């Protein structure tokens, strides 16, 4: 399953549309005013289905993930010198990025790819392509991309 994650050009807060391969909107992400990033994910019927919320006052960035109101885990940036690395405590996944922070791989505990993330270059807004190998993992993979993008925006 392929998703295209596109930040809206004119928006006061973080706001994204997520499209499937047919160009249909499958998710909408709306940022809220808060300390740190707080991103709410809505399905195509405008039902809130998930949240990514930044923990504040941590040494390295951490984001909590919720499905509905249920806490499912945390994504934490790990200290690394040359390429970004993130740990996910909910399902044993791990994220490795390249030096330029354009491409990422999400792998499970067995070293198998769960999803790949690629940033499209030469776009006015942040645009990512997410290739998810199991469609059931699409929402969780989207949450991880949101956390990575929010962490990058905080540094820039």
Regions found by a protein language model. Give the residues of each.
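Intrinsically disordered, low-complexity proline/glycine-rich segments
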Residues: 1-156
């Amino acid at each position: 399953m392929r998703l295209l994650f596109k930040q809206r050009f004119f928006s006061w807060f973080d706001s994204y549309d997520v499209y499937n391969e047919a160009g249909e909107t499958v998710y909408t992400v709306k940022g809220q005013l808060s300390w740190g990033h707080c991103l709410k994910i809505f399905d195509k019927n405008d039902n809130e289905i998930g949240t990514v919320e930044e923990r504040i006052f941590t040494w390295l960035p951490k984001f909590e993930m919720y499905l509905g109101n249920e806490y499912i885990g945390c994504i934490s940036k790990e200290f690394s010198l040359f390429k970004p690395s993130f740990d996910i405590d909910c399902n044993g996944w791990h994220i490795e990025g390249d030096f330029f922070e354009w491409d990422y791989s999400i792998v499970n505990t067995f070293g198998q790819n769960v999803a790949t993330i690629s940033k499209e270059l030469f776009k006015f807004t942040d645009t990512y392509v997410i290739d998810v190998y199991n469609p059931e993992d699409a929402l969780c993979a989207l949450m991880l991309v949101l956390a990575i993008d929010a962490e990058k925006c905080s540094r820039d």
